Amino acid sequence: MSPDSCPLVKNILLLDSEGKRVAVKYYSDDWPTNAAKLSFEKYVFSKTSKTNARTEAEITLLDSNIIVYKFAQDLHFFVTGGENENELILASVLQGFFDAVALLLRSNVEKMEALENLDLIFLCLDEMVDQGVVLETDPNVIAGKVAMQSTEASGSLSEQTLTQALATAREHLARSLLT
């Protein structure tokens, strides 16, 4: 398979309702400086913020980039690809990211919850895309891998608070019942 036939993502942005960064990941050198990245984010936000992308993802073409986006509560999700990329693949990346975040945040997809769980969101991005190449779009697989990594990193049950231990036990029980 040639590199040209592989769909590439240029960036994934998670912005708040004012266009400020919550979590962003760039996979392209199209924006070489931090100032260029911030300018792009502001531009994308200003062009899309007036649309109603709450129920379904919307697609737009801005500066030779296809941008697929969706809003939830006070968060705005964006996936950017080149003008020749397949919109359906970009939309599936967006939906996979959105649904995985919703699973990890227990359907409480809002800015404060996202900021409190920023590590999970970045792990989610790492599981989905590597150097622009789409690895996974299934939200259950993504959330499962992230949850597995976060429980491994959290250490033993004695180091966790009681509520964290109960949540971990509940997740392990649910996983064992499903398999």
Swiss-Prot record:
Keywords: Cytoplasm, Cytoplasmic vesicle, ER-Golgi transport, Golgi apparatus, Membrane, Protein transport, Transport
Main location as per UniProt: cytoplasm
A cellular component annotation (GO) from this entry: Golgi membrane
Family in the record: Belongs to the adaptor complexes small subunit family.
Membrane topology, from the record: Peripheral membrane protein
Quaternary structure, from the entry: Oligomeric complex that consists of at least the alpha, beta, beta', gamma, delta, epsilon and zeta subunits.
Cellular localisation: Cytoplasm; Golgi apparatus membrane; Cytoplasmic vesicle, COPI-coated vesicle membrane
Keyword Transport: yes
Function of the molecule: The coatomer is a cytosolic protein complex that binds to dilysine motifs and reversibly associates with Golgi non-clathrin-coated vesicles, which further mediate biosynthetic protein transport from the ER, via the Golgi up to the trans Golgi network. Coatomer complex is required for budding from Golgi membranes, and is essential for the retrograde Golgi-to-ER transport of dilysine-tagged proteins. The zeta subunit may be involved in regulating the coat assembly and, hence, the rate of biosynthetic protein transport due to its association-dissociation properties with the coatomer complex.
Biological process, per Gene Ontology: intra-Golgi vesicle-mediated transport; intracellular protein transport; retrograde vesicle-mediated transport, Golgi to endoplasmic reticulum
InterPro entries assigned: AP_mu_sigma_su (IPR022775), Coatomer_zeta (IPR039652), Longin-like_dom_sf (IPR011012)
Official protein name in the record: Coatomer subunit zeta-2
Pfam family, one: Clat_adaptor_s
PANTHER family linked: COATOMER SUBUNIT ZETA-2, ZETA-COAT PROTEIN
Record has Disulfide bond as a keyword: no
Highest rank taxon of the organism: Eukaryota
